[in-house]
Amino acid sequence: MTQYTPMIQQYLKVKADYQDAFLFFRLGDFYEMFFEDAVKAAHELEITLTSRDGGSSERIPMCGVPYHAAKNYIEQLVEKGYKVAVCEQVEDPKTAKGVVRREVVQLITPGTMMEGRTIDEKENNFLAALTHFEDGSYALACNDLTTGQNTVTLLTGSVEDILLEVYATGSKEIVVDSSFSKDELNKLTETLKMTISYEDATAIPEGLEHLVKNVSQAKLIKAVGRLFNYVIRTQKRSLDHLQPVEIYYTNQFMKIDVHSKRNLELTETLRTKEKTGSLLWLLDKTKTAMGGRMLKQWMERPLIQKERIEERLEMVETFVNDYFLREDLKEKLKEVYDLERLAGKVAFGNVNARDLLQLRRSLLQVPAILEAISLLDNAYAARLIQGADPCESLTELLGRSIQENPPLSIKDGDIIKDGYNDKLDQYRYVSKNGKTWIAELEKRERDITGIKSLKIGYNRIFGYYIEVTKANLGALPEGRYERKQTLANAERFITDELKEKETLILEAEEKIVQLEYDLFTALREEVKVFIPKLQHLAKVISELDVLQSFATVSEEEQFVKPVLTTKREIFIKDGRHPVVEKVLNGKLYVPNDCIMPEKMDVFLITGPNMSGKSTYMRQLALVTVMSQIGCFVPATEAVLPVFDQIFTRIGAADDLISGQSTFMVEMLEAKNAIANASERSLILFDEIGRGTSTYDGMALAQAIIEHIHDQIGAKTLFSTHYHELTVLEDSLDQLKNVHVSAIEENGKVVFLHKIQDGAADKSYGIHVAQLAELPDSLIARAKEVLAQLEGQEEIIIPKRVEVKAQEQEQEVIPEPIVVKEEPVEIEETKVDNEEESQLSFFGAEHSSKKQDKPVLDAKETAVLSQIKKIDLLDMTPLEAMNELYRLQKKLKKG
C-alpha cells in the first residue's frame, strides 16, 4: 500500500472496515469512490467513470457525486439493497497538518434508512436480528429506526416458520452472527430478498439497558443485544427515541403462511406486487401515516383472542353509529403529522424548523381528540387514552419560538420568532435599522450629487458600496468618495461612514444567523424530553385512526358486524369478496352464502372453469381475516368462529393471481396444512392433484379429503374438477357437495356465480375455450375427442376403509373396485388403430383390442337414451338400484 499517495492510503485504510459497502469518501465538495467501488457505482448510478493518479504505476478508477446531491445517489444504492458508508472530513482543511482527518459518520443500509423515497410513509422500515440457539430455537428482534419501535419473540418451529415470521415483519435487512448457517441464509435471501449483515456482539450496549427492563429471558436479550449493537455501530449518533422492547408470541395471533398471504393478496397483489387491488388497499381509509402503518401490522397478525377482537368490533360499531363523531375525528386526524417519525428525527438531530412546526400543528389537534374519546361509554376507549399527555407545554413552547414560514435549512436564519430571545431581538434591531440607514444614505447622496442612478449595493466580496455609472462620474464632487472597484460601465466607491455601518450590520446579521442556530439546537434538546410522551400519543392516535378507517369502509361498503362464536360453525349470509366487489365498481356482484354447521367440515366444490370457485374460497378467508382484525365483514349476516390458522393452496384462476406452481410446490403446501392444521383452522384447497396424471391426482385428492375429514376436522373448502370425488358425500358424513351453477343458452355457457347444493354436472371446459376465442377447428376437434372419451369411461370407486385408532400410524391403501364400461356406439364411425391409441387414456386393453360393434334394436336404443339422461349424482344408491332394476325389466320384456 506504500506505493499509493497518503490520501489513497487513508481511503484504503477506511475501506478495509467497510468491505460490504460503498465508501462515499469526502473530498472537498464531492464524495469520491475508488477502485471496485467506482466501477460498480458508475454502473449502478449511471455516472461517468474516470481515473486518477494514486501514486502507483496504474491509474485508479474513480467516480464521484456532488455532496449536495449525495442523498439522491445514496437512496438509489440502498434501494437496490446496497450499503453506503459516509466518510466525512472531521477537521478544517485550512488548519490540518498533512492529510485531512476523515471518519465514517454513518453506515446507511436498507434496514437503517431514516428518510427518502425508499421509505413508504405507511410502512415500517424494520431491521431484523436473528439468533439461532443449540436447542433449535430462534430469537427474532426487530427495530424500526424511523419510529424507534422494538419487538422481540422466540420461535421454535421449522425454518419455514422462521421465514413466515420474518416475512410478516416486512424487514429489508437481517442481522445474524458470522457463524450462521449458509443454507439458512440462502433461504432468507432467495425467499425474502433480504440484505444480510453480521454482528457477533450480543450484550446490551451501555446506556440502553432501560429498554429491556421487561425482558428476562436470556435468549431474547441476546437477540436484542445483537440488534442494538448493529444499530449503534452503523449509526454513530443519538438513539434517544428507541422505545422499550415489546415481547410478543406468535401463538397470540392467527398464523397465515407466506404462500397463503400472497395467494389471498392481503397487502399486495401477486401480479403487480402493489398495494392497489389488495385487501389493505380496500381497508385503508386512515388519515395519518402512523395509522396506515398500524393497519398493516394488524393485517399481518390477526388476533385469536375473542375478547380482544370484540373490543375492536364494539369500537368500530361506535364510530359506525355516530357519524358526527367519526367525521369530526377524521377532520382532526388530517392535521396530524407523523409523530413517530418526527420524534425519530428529533432524536437523530436532523429535524428542521418545518418539522417542529408540523409537530405543533399536530399537537393542537390532540386535546379535542382525547376529549371526544373520553366522553364515550366504552371501557376499551377509556383504557386506550389512559395516560395520554397532550403535551400542551410543548405546544406553547413551539408556538412562541418557531416562525410560521421557516426556511428548510436551519443555517439560513429567520427561524426564531421575535420576542423569544432578547439578544436576538437586539441584533435584529441593529440589522433592521442599519438597512434603513443605508436606504436613507442612498437618497441623500442622490440629492447631493444630482445623480438619480446612483445606488448603494452589497456583495459578499466587497461588502457595501456606492455605484456610479461612468457617464455620471463628472458630476461627483472631488474627493467625496474613495474608489473601491472599476467595472466596464461603472465605478464603485466607499466612504468611512458607510464602512462603519457595514461593520455594524454584517456583525449583527452573522450573529443573528449563529444565535438562531444555537437557539434552535437548544430548542431541539428541549423537545427530546417529550419523545416518550409523543410516542405514546402516536400509538393512541394510530389505533383510533385504524378503528375509524374500519368504520368508514364498513359504512361505505355496507359491511356488517360479525358475531363471534365459540362453536365450530360458519354462518355467512350473502357474503361477498370485498376487493372483487370494489373493482367491479357498481356492476352487479353475486353474493353467496357459506353455511357450515358444527358437524359440517368439508365443502367439496365443483363447477365450470372460471365460474368463481376460487373467488368464493378466497372470499371466506378474507371475511375471516377482516373479522379477526376487528373490522366489519362483507355480508348481510355473519356468525364466525375464531380460527387459529389459515392454509391455502390456490392456483392461477379467476384472474386474481398469476403464475402456475409446480406439482411439488402443490404437495409441499398441502403437506404444510396437513401437518399443522387443527380443528380450529381454515383450509382452502383449489384443484389439488391437477399437476399430475388424472388417476394419481384423483387418488391424492381423495386421500387428502379423507385425512382432513377424519383426522383434522378443520373447516375446509376443497374445489375439484374430479367429479368422481362427489360420491364421497355418501361415505363422509361431514362432507357436503356444493357447486357453482351455470346454464347453457343457444350453445353458450352463462356463469351464474351462485353456490348451490349438490355436485356440478359438467365442467364446461370447451365452452371456456370458446370464450377464450380458440380456433373453431380446434374447438370442433375437442368436442369429437370428448365424445369418444365419454364413451370409454372407467369409474374407480375406492372402498371406504375404517381405520382404528391404534392403526392410524400405519399406511392403509384402499382397495379399489374397478367397473369397466364397454363402449357403446350408436353410429358407425371409423377410427383407425393409430387414432384409437392416441385417444385412449385408460390402459392397454382398451387401446390394443378392437371392440366388436354391437347392433342395437329400437327398444335398446330407447333404454340407452334414458340411461344417458339419468343424473346419478343426484340419486341415492337405493334409487339408482331401483332405476337399474326398472330398466333391466323393460329390456327383458318380449
Swiss-Prot record:
InterPro entries, A to Z: DNA_mismatch_repair_MutS, DNA_mismatch_repair_MutS-lik_N, DNA_mismatch_repair_MutS/MSH, DNA_mismatch_repair_MutS_C, DNA_mismatch_repair_MutS_clamp, DNA_mismatch_repair_MutS_core, DNA_mismatch_repair_MutS_N, DNA_mismatch_repair_MutS_sf
Molecular function in Gene Ontology: ATP binding; ATP-dependent DNA damage sensor activity; damaged DNA binding; mismatched DNA binding
Alphabetized, the UniProt keywords read: ATP-binding, DNA damage, DNA repair, DNA-binding, Nucleotide-binding
Residues binding ATP: 607-614
GO BP field: mismatch repair
Family matches, as SUPFAM superfamilies = DNA repair protein MutS, domain I, DNA repair protein MutS, domain II, DNA repair protein MutS, domain III, P-loop containing nucleoside triphosphate hydrolases
What does the function comment of this entry state?
This protein is involved in the repair of mismatches in DNA. It is possible that it carries out the mismatch recognition step. This protein has a weak ATPase activity.
Protein name listed in UniProt: DNA mismatch repair protein MutS
Q: Which gene encodes it?
A: mutS
